[in-house]
Amino acid sequence: MESSPVNCLPPDSLHQIFSSLPIRDIMICRSVCKFFNQLLTSQCFIEIISTRPPLNLLALRPPHHHHSHRHSGNGHATNIRPYIHVYDPEQNQWFRFNLDFLPFRSPQPVASSSGLIYLWGDSIDLAESSKSLVACNPLTRQFKVLPQLGSAWSRHGTVLVDSVNRVMVLTELAALYYSGTVVANQWLKFSSNLPSKPRSPVLMSSSVFALCDVGSPWRSQWKLFSCKLTNLTITHTNWVCLEKHEWGDIFDIIKRPRLLRGNGDSKLLMIGGLKSTFSLNPACSTILILRLDLESLEWEEAGRMPLEMYRGFQESSKFKVFGGGDRVYFSAKRMGKLAMWDCWQGWRWIEGVPGYADGLCRGFVFDAKLTLMP
């Protein structure tokens, strides 16, 4: 490669040539030779292509039994290279990114935004049990450790990230908020004041949205709550129940509703089973996707799972919903594949899901891009 004519080209010309390639091809070229890898990982080149549209991928969270180390027969830990499985819906392909550049044991990816993946990582020092919340870009292999948190937050908190990488860790009783700008390199702590455990919270448009069950032990009654993150000098969050008379019984017809971010910053998705009756434990006829316009506060039906596809979920006692934006994904026990709803192309199956013996996987949207750490 040293004698190749490409070495005679000035760096500006090479940057111009490679910046015209799709991100997929740039990643392939990085593995061709050491010269290409140095060129395509340089800060100058990354700054040039950081404004390029991202790859819209699905990243899978590791199974609960998955660890990046295992014990060998002699009782010693054997390291396994940590990685994250991702799916490219445009190419209908599974592949994975190595996370071996992170100085942490057992990294557990939990969220993503603006090209960064957020994960919990165990301290390398086996004598400590503390976990750190880390932001990283597996394409550039850069990372940043957020201010230290107690391990209880990783066990009980839900990590939320918005489009400008503001981070919240939310529990029923308290919330932590980090922007890196309001108070430099510190978490702000608030009391949550929620009536019950928040389900599938979403952080978007400087607001948090969550579902809470305010019903009785024998009958669920779901309500939608929101909280604006406008005054960060107070010590508690003011949650407001969003409801309109025109909504009617919309929360009564959905079984086990869950929220996801919609397309843009003004749409919220609610997904759940469509009840066939109003009895205490009704059967469901299919899975329904509803879309709420946050400006007009009007609901509309966005999608309804085809009956032949729903039969596989009907036979499963449990299923998961994840994704967001233009695509929603569904997994179920013993299914062996994912169902995907695309708001433009409808419903289809995704085969070849890796790493899940029981089929019940979880994941999140990963908009992969070559960008520098903020």
Curated annotation (Swiss-Prot):
It comes from the Eukaryota. GO terms for biological process: protein ubiquitination; ubiquitin-dependent protein catabolic process. Gene3D superfamilies: 1.20.1280.50, Kelch-type beta propeller. Its main location: nucleus. It is found in: Nucleus. Keywords: Nucleus, Ubl conjugation pathway. GO terms for cellular component: nucleus. Residues 3-48 form the F-box domain. Pathway: Protein modification; protein ubiquitination. Component of SCF(ASK-cullin-F-box) E3 ubiquitin ligase complexes, which may mediate the ubiquitination and subsequent proteasomal degradation of target proteins. The F-box is necessary for the interaction with ASK proteins. Part of a SCF (ASK-cullin-F-box) protein ligase complex. Interacts with SKP1A/ASK1, SKP1B/ASK2, ASK11 and ASK13. This is SKP1-interacting partner 15.
